[in-house]
Amino acid sequence: MQYLAIAVIVALAGLSAAAHKPAYYDDNMANQMVDQIVKSLTTKKELDPFKIEQTKVPIDKKIGLIHIKGSATIKNAVITGLSHISRRGDAKIDTDGGAFAATLKLGDKNIRIKTDLHLDLGKIIHPNLKFEGHIGDIDMKLKLKLDAEGKPSLDQFEIDEFEQVELFIHGLGPLDPLVDVIADSFVKYFNPQARKLVTDMLKPILVEEIKKLKLN
């Protein structure tokens, strides 16, 4: 299974450049801040397993002279392994034009997706399939801003596209040539939906957990 690397960019913006960097801006404090945020995410039951609502994915593609058109209904979709997220290496803090930024990487080797798939291609082809995959690199962008007293709050949070998705479809039999067509359609439409659902679920959790951050 491919290594999952999550690049998280924490930007602490809107601050005046100071002659001496405050204690909570050193690398140790950045690591401490990020570790608290990560811990709060990995302990949430909603995160693992993460369930995706039923959705219908359109299929419309030409292979040579053959035009394949129809849909695939995704049911009982579940992403597992998100709770294994952890920080790797130190957060690095740099200053640029009075802003502070920390870059770090989080890693995991257990991200998987499983779903039932009902294929509807014309009047004849309606198989029920089992669909599973391994998800590769995911980028996560997290921006924090500080008020005048140095208290952090969430400024921006988003998840980039799921890349390096390795998919396996069971139950096609003689329809195996359709694997690539189904996989391409799945990634194209599942990617934005899954990203939005994960983002919408995590964002309010982040807002509350950032309020609880304690820097020693």
Swiss-Prot record:
The keyword Signal applies. GO terms for cellular component: extracellular region. Keywords: Allergen, Secreted, Signal. Pfam families: Grp7_allergen. It is found in: Secreted. Residues 1-19 form the signal peptide. InterPro entries: Mite_allergen_7_sf, Mite_allergen_group-7. Belongs to the mite group 7 allergen family. This is Mite allergen Lep d 7. The lineage of its organism: Eukaryota, Metazoa, Ecdysozoa, Arthropoda, Chelicerata.
